[in-house]
């Protein structure tokens, strides 16, 4: 790691006696000489630091960040704020430089400290499916630029796609940073007109996450209140709980304003809970003079040591790149340890959710014919099982939904009410009909004798009125069953559009066939009802009850609801007698029609319809030439399944790695 005199303020630091400088492939200015207890403490530190960072880096490499936010340090700043210089100083490698937008893709900078001083520098640039191994720090700038062009294209466009730069060296800190494009306010040249919006959207995507520490780079020679990067950080982190300010270019401060910069660095002006650090990196003149990063660190150390105002910040541990490196590593480790339990729960919940979602899309379709046959058998078997559940009234329903049988029973209850209402509402008309028939058709019978023809004619007319309502109920229930069967097809075959279409076609064909048979049976029943018949003992019992009820009402001088508008029974004994017979027969025929019509509908429209559909679906297995056609998926189904499987695999691997983590 990088150490400096800032460590003198922290005697318990494992690096208190070290003065390693970050310098890429340059030689060390001062080498550490760790002995005894210090060396043991350093080893313990390395044992804790590296596994934490490696864990998060490995999760990021798995792509877990596509599903969940991971602990990270995001580096943001306005253009020309010195952001690139800070990253160069930390990593020891030169990153793409130039005017305008240089960072055009988020760059994950993974710094790994090698234990042995003799270990050679190595690097790796990864993006999409490409991995470029680097053996020299001088290759970094070129390869990162090439990666940006490959992702974002030539020009000045930006992309949300990540580039990973891994640097392993004895002279870098254990740290992972995400470098984001510099904020620009005005589009210049051939930049997109909305470049400011694009960049800010990309930055917000990272800094808004609670798992991200925001490293805001601010030049000392500008008014901190006008800094866009700090304003954006404040929007997503109003309390400054996860924001660290990095003050750059202290050598460009106007004379007489140094005290103001010291106040800012001491967190007295624009308060952040994590405070500020101040660094001096290579300027443009240093770069032109080819000042090495190692020499730049020496120059920075000397600058703060000799500066009348800023030397106090150095003594307080608030200044220089080495102090910043140590601070960032410490912050990242604490942040990782703090967020790991939450991350573990999030991964567990996401894993469960994706597993459930993946079940909806089923398994992959086998390639071989035998496998396809068994796959189709399973699909049709599941469909037929659901149809059986519907027939038996045992299907599973979600909250607030009714079973099919419940909906049918409701229709049957309405039918029973229609039958009862038909007879009750007809009593007024019946009285008039009885009088009409008596006046027109009574033959040589004396008054008081019941005319059976009158009774029979009225009964037939009353029953025939119910035929069309019965057929209407048949159509209503048929639609309910058809919709229920279609829903089962959609549930089981939704991803296989040809299979679903075939099932729907069969449902429609069988529905028409069974509906026709049911209607024929219903109309036949009403034809049979034109034969006035009831078992003698049943009819006698019904007639006796009607007479007893009438006698009781007469005795109590109360009018039954049925006789509110009818003439008094005593006014015409013949009419009263026929009326009693009509009521008795209505009661029995009403019971018969109320029960038998629903029975016909259940038999043809539910049971036979379902059974015929099941047989018809099984017949699909006989035509092997159609397997491919029937099992053709929707265009997005296989892609969605593949996407979910990849997510599930990532999260499964993430859970395993978290389980193995010693922390």
Swiss-Prot record:
Annotated region (Middle domain), positions in chain: 367-534
Induction: By type I and type III interferons.
Segments for region (G3 motif): 179-182
Transmembrane segments: none
Modified residues (N-acetylmethionine): 1
Residue numbers spanned by region G2 motif: 102-104
Keyword list, A-Z: Acetylation, Antiviral defense, Cytoplasm, Endoplasmic reticulum, GTP-binding, Immunity, Innate immunity, Membrane, Nucleotide-binding, Ubl conjugation
Residue segments, region Stalk: 368-633
Region (Critical for lipid-binding): 555-558
Residues binding GTP: 77-84, 179-183, 248-251
PTM comment, free text: ISGylated.
Keyword Lipid biosynthesis tagged: no
GO cellular component, one term: perinuclear region of cytoplasm
Region feature (Bundle signaling element (BSE)): 342-367
Cellular location(s): Cytoplasm; Endoplasmic reticulum membrane; Cytoplasm, Perinuclear region
Record flagged with keyword Translocase: no
Region of interest called G4 motif, as start-end residue ranges on this chain: 248-251
Cross-referenced SUPFAM superfamilies: P-loop containing nucleoside triphosphate hydrolases
Region (Disordered): 551-570
Spans annotated as G1 motif: 77-84
Protein family membership: Belongs to the TRAFAC class dynamin-like GTPase superfamily. Dynamin/Fzo/YdjA family.
Function: Interferon-induced dynamin-like GTPase with antiviral activity against influenza A virus, (IAV). Inhibits IAV replication by decreasing or delaying NP synthesis and by blocking endocytic traffic of incoming virus particles.
The protein, known as: Interferon-induced GTP-binding protein Mx1
Species of provenance: Sus scrofa
